[in-house]
Structures are given as structure tokens and as C-alpha cells.
């Protein structure tokens, strides 16, 4: 299934988190935190400004980003995989 985000929305897939501690202990449950790094899968056309022009997004498909995992993050299952739909405002940085 193809999915295309609207406006300033971005679809990302969370990166896997290392489940071993520095001492070699396997972390499970609440001890294993979710990653806030993700790969950008799709981007909308941009934010519509008050004057009607569209401001393109700074992120592009394939970028690795660090995002704010909180209110406004929508999780969805697409073809059996969990993806997140977020606003570009929730992206804190692009990893280069």
C-alpha cells in the first residue's frame, strides 16, 4: 500500500534500539527505551503559508532524523510495519 502525507506531514520508520546494555545485559520492557531516530519514508508537499504559497520541507526521503516522540505523533500499521506520521515541526535534527 502506498501512503502520501499531506502538507507538512512526514512519514518515518523508527530505527531499532540496541537491546544490550554496556555491560552486556539484555534490556527488556520499560528498560529498553524506544529510539527517537528514524528514517524518512515520505514527505508532504510543504506547509501552506497565510499568503497561500507552499513552503517546501527541509527533510527529504531517505534522511535519518531525530524527532520529538510525544503528543501529535500518530502510529499506523502499513503493510504490517509500524510507521509514524508526524509534523515537520516535531523533527529536531537531520543526522548527517
UniProtKB/Swiss-Prot annotation:
InterPro entries: Chaperonin_GroES (IPR020818), Chaperonin_GroES_sf (IPR037124), Chaprnonin_Cpn10_CS (IPR018369), GroES-like_sf (IPR011032). CDD domains: cpn10 (cd00320). PROSITE patterns: CHAPERONINS_CPN10. GO terms for biological process: chaperone cofactor-dependent protein refolding. It is found in: Cytoplasm. Keywords: Chaperone, Cytoplasm. GO terms for molecular function: ATP binding; metal ion binding; protein folding chaperone; protein-folding chaperone binding; unfolded protein binding. Pfam families: Cpn10 (PF00166). GO terms for cellular component: cytoplasm. Belongs to the GroES chaperonin family. Heptamer of 7 subunits arranged in a ring. Interacts with the chaperonin GroEL. Together with the chaperonin GroEL, plays an essential role in assisting protein folding. The GroEL-GroES system forms a nano-cage that allows encapsulation of the non-native substrate proteins and provides a physical environment optimized to promote and accelerate protein folding. GroES binds to the apical surface of the GroEL ring, thereby capping the opening of the GroEL channel. This is Co-chaperonin GroES. It comes from Actinobacillus succinogenes (strain ATCC 55618 / DSM 22257 / CCUG 43843 / 130Z). The gene is groES.
